């Protein structure tokens, strides 16, 4: 489903908490970039949409990678917590920041254990009138080695 002519496309932020994710961040970025570009091309979301990485006090090079990705790729941005505060607090920090910029916010784990193709269905449900869309995975049969 795309927006009708004359209606403003909505800004999507995908909030991705990150803790010591340097091993997976490059692949995560590649896949999320591809998904976001597809959604923009299909006129499901605004060009102002972003993926927001939230560094949760990582001890490895995660924050450095987020900074480099954000400099190279317009679709990506990042924030860094002063120290490790835990997944839920990193998620909350990202959501609280994203709400200032986005019409739609989706959370996703950095290891891509969530199916990024579900984003399309979630956005469709939003445009159908849902205020909240919640996804629960029923099986892990399709997981690649990268996600396990």
Regions from the PLM with identified roles:
Residues 3-144:
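Structured catalytic core of nucleotide-sugar glycosyltransferases
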Residues 148:
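Active-site Tyr-X1-5-Lys
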